[in-house]
């Protein structure tokens, strides 16, 4: 009888202690959230890496990672199949994916939601030295790289070629490659011209220009107007002289917006915290009294210091070009801001 009475309080103590120590353990359980970006030679990957690190430091119990990949179209398909939580995509590709048009004909990505527009992506037409390409009238008969097959860059290439009255049949050869692959082919003189849609300066072009002379092929005003009339999600832009070595003149081009999109199944509170951490100073992490956690820079501010295109990531333009539904978590944040 004595042993039984002694045993019961002991068991109760063990249970109580297990509950005490299990509570914090459960509370500290971390979740994972990924951002699908693009190839290492583009802008998505470095900016995605900076954003992932910045937000991981601002939001407790979540590990955010950036994954390299095949960019816009592929990222939409990864979200559709719930293989990844979020990704960077062009706004025109996001529109096509959600509505099941263009390259997504009959295969809509209805679980695609927007968090924010980030920065302009410029359609850069890069020609190698000696290719005989100074303007768009020189493109016909050349060896073309329109981007990866099925990529957002290829979509942009086809739009530009349409505006110029050209198709793939007008070229001597067409190869589908990543930005890095395109840069190598141009360097090796195995291709004449490549389309690269990314925020400038783009790593693949910068690297190419350090070892080879290049030309940024300008679009004429008539072609730009024709393309924008047909595809109103594009806008006219100028790539400043000096963006790349040896390119000492301004280059007229067209641009679209890079957007951060997310799976609709991601919880509202998670996306709210991500959106708030992107735009607001401070942190969700509990700090010791007297520290400067409230002054911690926003994700956008950190991106601005890390990359030239990061300076274009602003709350003012967060909803520019958004043509798909906002995720409820993002919508909650923008409503609080009166947007």
Can you name each region flagged by the protein language model?
Residues 28-97, 105:
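N-terminal (or domain-start) structured segment
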Residues 142-159, 233-313:
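Ligand-binding clefts/hinges and TM-proximal coupling segments of bilobed small-molecule sensing domains
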Residues 181, 188, 198-216, 226-232, ...:
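An extracytoplasmic/periplasmic, membrane-proximal ligand-sensing/linker region
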Residues 30-58, 62-63, 117, 121-188, ...:
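Bilobed "Venus flytrap"/periplasmic-binding protein-like clamshell domains
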Residues 91-93, 101-103, 131, 167-267:
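Pocket-lining segment of extracytoplasmic ligand-binding domains
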Residues 30, 59-61, 71-74, 81, ...:
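Extracytoplasmic
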Residues 1-31:
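Short, low-complexity disordered leader/linker segments with a strong preference
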Residues 105-118, 123, 243-252:
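A structural signal for short loop-to-beta-strand junctions that line the ligand-binding cleft
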């Amino acid at each position: 009888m004595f042993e039984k009475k002694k045993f019961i309080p002991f068991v109760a103590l063990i249970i109580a202690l297990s509950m005490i120590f299990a509570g914090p353990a459960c509370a500290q359980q971390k979740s994972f959230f990924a951002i699908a970006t693009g190839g290492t030679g583009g802008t998505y990957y470095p900016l995605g890496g900076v954003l992932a690190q910045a937000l991981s430091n601002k939001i407790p119990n979540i590990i955010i990672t950036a994954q390299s990949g095949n960019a816009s179209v592929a990222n939409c398909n990864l979200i559709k199949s719930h293989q990844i939580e979020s990704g960077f995509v062009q706004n025109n590709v996001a529109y096509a994916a959600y509505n099941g048009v263009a390259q997504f004909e009959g295969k809509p990505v209805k679980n695609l939601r927007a968090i924010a527009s980030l920065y302009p992506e410029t359609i850069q037409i890069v020609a190698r030295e000696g290719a005989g390409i100074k303007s768009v009238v020189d493109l016909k008969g050349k060896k073309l790289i329109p981007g990866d097959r099925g990529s957002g860059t290829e979509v942009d290439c086809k739009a530009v070629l349409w505006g110029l009255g050209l198709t793939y049949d007008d070229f001597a050869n067409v190869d589908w490659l990543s930005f890095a692959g395109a840069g190598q082919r141009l360097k090796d003189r195995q291709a004449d011209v490549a389309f690269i849609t990314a925020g400038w300066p783009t790593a693949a072009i910068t690297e190419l220009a350090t070892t080879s002379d290049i030309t940024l092929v300008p679009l004429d005003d008539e072609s730009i107007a024709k393309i924008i009339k047909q595809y109103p999600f594009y806008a006219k832009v100028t790539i400043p002289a000096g963006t790349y070595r040896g390119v000492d003149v301004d280059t007229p081009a067209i641009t679209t917006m890079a957007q951060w999109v997310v799976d609709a199944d991601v919880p509202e509170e998670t996306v709210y915290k991500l959106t708030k951490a992107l735009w607001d100073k401070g942190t969700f992490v509990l700090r010791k009294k007297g520290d400067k956690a409230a002054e911690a820079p926003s994700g956008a501010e950190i991106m601005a210091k890390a990359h030239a295109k990061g300076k274009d990531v602003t709350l003012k333009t967060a909803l520019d070009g958004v043509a798909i539904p906002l995720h409820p978590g993002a919508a909650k944040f923008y409503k609080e801001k009166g947007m």
